[in-house]
């Protein structure tokens, strides 16, 4: 029953609106994990996006409940529009499966002009074991400049290496520049 409730919570998060890659499984104080993502079938507005390395994140586990995380998401459209999202957030784990995050954002858009915006991002993240080495994850974030969600699945190749695939969507509104970024990403993570 507990897994059903958690799965329903993750599905609800995915259907509403800081994106993260596969989270650390069984986090311990002092753990450090880095993820890098490769985008395919990406869209910037209604156009294709040609950016391949689409960002990643670095997470450091401070305690049994707290992490600090830096996240970068980069998209370059076929028309050379660029959107670079950066977040520095604190994550608080309520349970091994559900956490909340809050922090600052810096978003830079390069179109016919360049705009930069500092703001905030808050949201929820969830993860659930699916099988011995598999886990599902989802997140939803809201802020003054960006609304974002993602849903994905990760596979632990070794205790330190994992691979993941996810769908990510981000709605950006920076100084009267509105755009959407969405698409599929694959990535690798390493826990030091």
What does each model-found stretch correspond to?
Residues 20-77:
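Short glycine/proline- and aromatic-enriched beta-strand/turn motifs that initiate or cap beta-hairpins
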Residues 33, 55-59, 87-89, 121-123, ...:
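Membrane-embedded beta-strand positions in outer-membrane beta-barrel channels/transporters
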Residues 32, 64-70, 96-102, 130-136, ...:
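Repeated loop/turn-to-beta-strand initiation elements of outer-membrane beta-barrel proteins
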Residues 1-33:
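Cleavable N-terminal export/targeting peptides
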Residues 122, 128, 155-162, 179-192:
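Outer-membrane beta-barrel "beta-signal"
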Residues 36-44, 64, 72-76, 104-110, ...:
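Transmembrane beta-strands of outer-membrane beta-barrel pores
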């Amino acid at each position: 029953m507990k897994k059903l409730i958690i799965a329903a919570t993750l599905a609800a998060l995915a259907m509403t609106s800081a994106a993260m890659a596969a989270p650390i499984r069984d986090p311990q104080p002092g753990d450090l994990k880095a993820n890098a993502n490769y985008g395919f079938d990406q869209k910037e507005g209604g156009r294709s996006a040609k950016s391949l390395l689409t960002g990643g994140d670095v997470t450091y586990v401070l305690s049994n409940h707290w992490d600090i995380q830096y996240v970068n998401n980069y998209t370059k459209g076929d028309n050379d529009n660029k959107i670079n999202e950066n977040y520095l957030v604190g994550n608080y784990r309520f349970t091994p499966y559900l956490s909340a995050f809050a922090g600052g954002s810096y978003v830079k858009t390069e179109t016919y002009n360049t705009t930069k915006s500092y703001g905030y991002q808050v949201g929820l993240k969830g993860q659930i074991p699916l099988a011995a080495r598999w886990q599902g994850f989802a997140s939803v974030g809201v802020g003054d400049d960006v609304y974002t969600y993602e849903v994905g699945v990760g596979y632990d190749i070794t205790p330190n290496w994992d691979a993941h695939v996810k769908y990510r969507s981000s709605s950006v509104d920076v100084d009267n520049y509105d755009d959407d970024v969405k698409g599929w990403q694959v990535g690798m993570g390493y826990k030091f």
